[in-house]
Design a protein with these regions (language model features):
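Conserved structural motif at the start of ABC-family nucleotide-binding domains
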Residues: 4-6, 19
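Short coil-to-beta microelement around the adenine-binding A-loop and adjacent beta1/P-loop entry
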Residues: 16-19, 76
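Short hydrophobic beta-strand immediately N-terminal to the Walker A/P-loop
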Residues: 32-34, 46
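The feature captures the beta-strand-to-loop junction immediately N-terminal to the Walker
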Residues: 35-40
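Helix-to-loop junction immediately C-terminal to a conserved catalytic motif
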Residues: 50
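ABC ATPase NBD Q-loop/coupling interface
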Residues: 61-77, 149
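ABC-family P-loop ATPase nucleotide-binding domains
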Residues: 90-159
Length: 159
């Protein structure tokens, strides 16, 4: 079963049709890149997935774990695991990067589980996991102690 499925999606903004019949299926653990020239609808698709009010779905459907999300508000979609990673992310003082990663990890773990059990990793377990793996993506240990996106280089933000 597809985790995210977009079926013949048509989207307009201010009465102008931007997306025309978009289809996409993603499976568990898959990573996809949406690429295209300026004005091709990449941002429109991202904002539509998150339920931005300026974008109207005129036909088609968006399914997350087999259920339509078209009637869900943005925060409800986020609780189900849909997030948008910005090209130029805002700095968030007071929110630790490792806390953000753990929250994301727990949301993804829950979404990938086949049963209804809670599957949260403790702070201690996650800190150990991070220390063992942070170097694999070319980052230093002090990276984890920073606030979200605060003082990161462009390359660090992308990682």
């Amino acid at each position: 079963m597809a985790v995210l499925e977009i079926k013949d999606l048509c989207v307009s903004r201010d009465g102008k049709e931007i997306l025309k019949g978009v289809n996409l299926k993603t499976g568990p653990g898959e990573v996809h890149a949406i690429m295209g020239p300026n004005g091709s609808g990449k941002s429109t698709l991202a904002y539509t997935l998150l339920g931005h009010p300026k974008y109207q779905v005129t036909s088609g459907d968006i399914l997350l774990d087999g259920e339509s999300i078209l009637n869900l508000k943005t925060d409800e979609r986020a609780k189900k695991g849909l997030f948008l990673g910005f090209q130029y992310p805002t700095e968030v003082s007071g929110v630790g990067f490792s806390h953000f990663l753990r929250t994301s990890y727990n949301a993804l773990s829950k979404a990938l589980k086949d049963d209804e059990r809670e599957v949260f990793i403790t702070v201690r377990e996650f800190q150990k996991y991070l220390k063992e793996n942070v170097n694999d993506v070319g980052l230093k240990d002090d990276f984890l102690a920073r606030y979200l996106n605060e003082g990161f280089s462009g390359g660090e933000k992308k990682r």
